[in-house]
Amino acid sequence: MSIIKKPDLTDPKLRAKLAKGMGHHYYGEPAWPNDILYMFPVVILGILACDVGLSILEPSVIGEPANPFATPLEILPEWYFFPTFNLLRVIPNKLVGVLSMASVPAGLITVPFIESVNKFQNPFRRPIATSVFLVGTIVAVWLGIGATMPLSKAITLGLF
């Protein structure tokens, strides 16, 4: 925003130009019809051309072909399900595992109410939300890495 020059609407010369319909370069071009009718189709066609060009020039295979007669030793979910998969795998009681997964969104919902007295947007001035974010990220990465290891090393990652 610091690069864009904001118009001084108290300037009588600018007001006179605006009254005549001139001077639109002073405050930018209107979105309709310039951007919507002309720029959006150009951008969409450019992205489409890049996609088609890349798919023709570099037709890479997505993974290895499936073999219906060979079963993998351990079936793993997609990478974004690794933390929840590992959590369900290491907790012996499945009800406790499901409740622990349900406690994550419930805990995140309570954070704004705990910090409702704090009106700052700076994350360093909101210690509870920042701590919850950092601890949650570290735990999720830890559980995600542990999901790719055997069950005996799933929590310790073989470090301890």
UniProtKB/Swiss-Prot annotation:
Any signal peptide, and if so, which residues?
Answer: none
Q: Which CDD domains match?
A: cytochrome_b_C
What SUPFAM superfamilies does the record tag this protein with? a domain/subunit of cytochrome bc1 complex (Ubiquinol-cytochrome c reductase)
Its Gene Ontology molecular function terms? electron transporter, transferring electrons within cytochrome b6/f complex of photosystem II activity; electron transporter, transferring electrons within the cyclic electron transport pathway of photosynthesis activity; oxidoreductase activity
KW Signal (keyword) present: no
Segments forming a coiled coil: none
Instruction: Report the subcellular localization.
Output: Plastid, Chloroplast thylakoid membrane
Q: Under the cellular component aspect of Gene Ontology, which terms does the record hold? A: chloroplast thylakoid membrane
Keyword entries, A-Z: Chloroplast, Electron transport, Membrane, Photosynthesis, Plastid, Thylakoid, Transmembrane, Transmembrane helix, Transport
Q: Where are the transmembrane segments?
A: 36-56, 95-115, 127-147
Is Signal a UniProt keyword of this protein? no
Q: How does it sit in the membrane?
A: Multi-pass membrane protein
Q: Name one Pfam family in it.
A: Cytochrom_B_C
BP GO annotations: photosynthetic electron transport chain
Cite the record's note on assembly.
The 4 large subunits of the cytochrome b6-f complex are cytochrome b6, subunit IV (17 kDa polypeptide, petD), cytochrome f and the Rieske protein, while the 4 small subunits are petG, petL, petM and petN. The complex functions as a dimer.
Q: Which family does it belong to?
A: Belongs to the cytochrome b family. PetD subfamily.
Role according to the record: Component of the cytochrome b6-f complex, which mediates electron transfer between photosystem II (PSII) and photosystem I (PSI), cyclic electron flow around PSI, and state transitions.
| Name of this chain's protein | Cytochrome b6-f complex subunit 4
Q: Which organism is it from?
A: Gracilaria tenuistipitata var. liui
